[in-house]
């Protein structure tokens, strides 16, 4: 056991990240670290974060940034205020842009690529872009009945005498097709719906053995009864296909007003519609232009909004806002079905702690933000029970006090989960984890402060893009923040050397620090003695091992802070 006169040597190393918990901070963590991280692609050292380089200014709020490659040509689209722009000379500055659309929603948009087509949604629009043309998504026209006799009854040649429905109604289009076999006697054909849309909305069409027929020229329509009368009676066994329009109640807006989407099981799932707070919709297999009117699932009965839909562990997790006396977690499991091939019944989870902002599948860890911080979902066998595992105790005291906490935005970047809140970024490190006192696995964290308020964040091919309210778009690179110095520091935890009540004196032999050589001539070292800054020393990192001295007497605890701009 050491006596009071013993020389105690400290070796501070294997630094892991920050600890803002105000508890006993480990020697490997810092209670006060700013704008530093570990770039695993470069070295294992803690170093200053990259800078922010201005790419362009678009004179309105950045709400979306989309990269799309078609035939080896990269297309860059930017959602700026109410406009969707094509950045034709990316990444050159100033930007040369082409307006593709001028009625975008003033909220953050999202995208996905399906069958080499870029699809974009913003809460009021559902658009597609093929590299040349941007247009509203045109829904696949379903064949809602077939093998019909002219009177609408089932054909005697069919395999069954029940009324067959070939394809359900598509929410993304008002159009439907009916197929018949002509009997050589009937001019009137009964459709499978009545009270059709007016002729001003859609002039009906038909084909007889693939020969096009047009309303008011080749046939007339009784829209109230859904009856088509041909001028010339179709021949026996001729194939008659009639296309008509019947708008379903709020069908289109079910999907257009969704604010969340994700790909799962070769389908696109949609949710977040404020008018359908419990609903999750999905498209048909490999067809994002077709959302049948029965393809939705109710997650709960309350008005708590769905905040996140996250694929993970072969299910789709549905996370809702906090609601008293009700589960906030549901999951949809792919299930074989004789009618629709696949359905996704909703199962009530066992977690009631609500999601207050968003969530993500972070390297196979399904996480979301509650009013207590970042939570991870762990499963018992067969999903019979879900268990919450806390992931952010090291930064909760600071992160939860952020005024914009409920509007946190997420991006994965170089193995980190970046949690953006205004101008602050909290970085969860997927490669450094620890087990807390409750045996939960948590992340190590870093913390950045940016010189500009940032409202948009996106990662693409290991590049990080940041946008703001005034239309500035930055990329994370370089050694300055758009020519401004980056102030960074790392403070070792308070150390009383095992004797809290006794005073100490530093040894005259001094200290050494192991630097990564970055040719920085302005590394400042401060000593913080019993809470007061005492000394300042300026060092250079031209050598890897650099000696320095600390001269302090009669202190109870001491810290060392390294800083640089």
Residue ranges and their predicted role:
Residues 137-234, 245-257:
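Extended beta-strand solenoid/passenger and fiber regions
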Residues 52-61, 98-106, 251-409, 447:
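Beta-propeller and closely related beta-pinwheel folds
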Residues 47-50, 140-177, 283-289, 392, ...:
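A general sequence property marking short-to-moderate contiguous segments
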Residues 108-157:
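Hydrophobic or amphipathic alpha-helical targeting/insertion segments
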Residues 235-239, 555-557:
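Extracellular Ig-like/FN3 beta-sandwich strand-entry sites
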Residues 82, 124, 131-132, 209-211, ...:
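Residue-level detection of beta-strand-connecting loop/turn positions
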Residues 188-205, 270, 504-519:
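Beta-rich globular "head" domains
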Residues 1-117, 350-354, 361-365, 372, ...:
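Beta-sheet repeat architectures centered on beta-propellers
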């Amino acid at each position: 056991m050491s006596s009071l006169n013993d020389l105690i040597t400290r070796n501070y190393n294997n630094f892991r990240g920050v600890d803002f918990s105000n508890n006993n901070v480990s020697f490997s963590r810092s209670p006060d670290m700013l704008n530093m991280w570990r770039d695993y692609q470069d070295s294992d050292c803690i170093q200053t974060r990259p800078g922010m380089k201005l790419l362009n200014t678009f004179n309105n709020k950045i709400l979306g940034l989309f990269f799309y490659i078609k035939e080896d040509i990269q297309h860059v689209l930017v959602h700026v205020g109410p406009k969707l722009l094509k950045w034709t000379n990316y990444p050159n500055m100033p930007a040369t842009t082409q307006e593709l659309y001028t009625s975008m929603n003033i909220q953050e948009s999202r995208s996905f690529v399906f069958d080499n087509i870029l699809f974009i949604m913003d809460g009021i629009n559902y658009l597609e872009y093929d590299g040349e043309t941007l247009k509203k998504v045109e829904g696949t026209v379903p064949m809602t009945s077939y093998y019909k006799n002219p009177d609408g009854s089932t054909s005697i040649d069919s395999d069954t005498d029940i009324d067959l429905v070939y394809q359900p109604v598509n929410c993304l289009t008002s159009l439907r097709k009916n197929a018949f076999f002509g009997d050589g006697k009937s001019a009137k054909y009964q459709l499978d719906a009545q009270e059709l849309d007016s002729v001003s909305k859609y002039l009906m069409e038909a084909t007889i053995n693939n020969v096009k027929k047009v309303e008011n020229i080749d046939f007339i329509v009784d829209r109230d009864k859904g009856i088509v009368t041909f001028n010339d009676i179709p021949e026996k066994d001729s194939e008659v296909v009639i296309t008509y329009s019947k708008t379903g109640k709020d069908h289109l807006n079910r999907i257009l007003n969704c604010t969340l989407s994700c790909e799962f099981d070769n389908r696109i799932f949609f949710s977040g519609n404020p008018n359908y707070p419990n609903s999750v919709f999905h498209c048909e297999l490999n067809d994002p232009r077709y959302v049948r009117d029965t393809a939705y699932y109710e997650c709960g009965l309350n008005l708590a909004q769905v905040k996140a839909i996250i694929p993970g562990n072969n299910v789709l997790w549905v996370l809702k806002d906090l609601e008293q006396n009700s589960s906030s977690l549901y999951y949809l499991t792919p299930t074989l079905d004789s009618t629709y091939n696949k359905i996704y019944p909703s199962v009530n989870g066992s977690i009631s702690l609500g999601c207050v902002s968003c969530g993500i599948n972070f390297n196979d860890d399904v996480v979301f933000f509650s009013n207590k911080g970042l939570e991870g979902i762990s499963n018992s066998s067969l999903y019979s029970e879900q268990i919450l595992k806390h992931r952010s105790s090291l930064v909760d005291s600071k992160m939860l006090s952020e005024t914009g906490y409920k509007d946190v935005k997420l991006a994965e970047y170089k193995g980190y989960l970046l949690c953006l809140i205004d101008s602050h970024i909290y970085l969860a490190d997927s490669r450094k984890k620890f087990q807390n006192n409750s045996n939960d696995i948590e992340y190590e964290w870093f913390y950045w402060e940016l010189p500009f308020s940032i409202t948009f964040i996106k990662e693409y091919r290991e590049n990080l893009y940041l946008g703001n309210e005034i239309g500035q778009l930055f990329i994370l690179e370089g050694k300055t923040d758009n020519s401004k110095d980056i102030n960074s520091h790392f403070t070792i935890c308070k150390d009383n050397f095992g004797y809290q009540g006794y005073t100490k004196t530093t040894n005259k032999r001094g200290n050494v620090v192991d630097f990564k050589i970055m040719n920085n001539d302005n590394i400042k070292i401060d000593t913080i003695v019993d809470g007061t800054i005492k000394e300042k020393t300026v060092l250079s990192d031209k050598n890897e091992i650099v000696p320095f001295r600390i001269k302090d007497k009669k202190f109870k605890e001491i810290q060392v802070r390294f800083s640089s701009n």
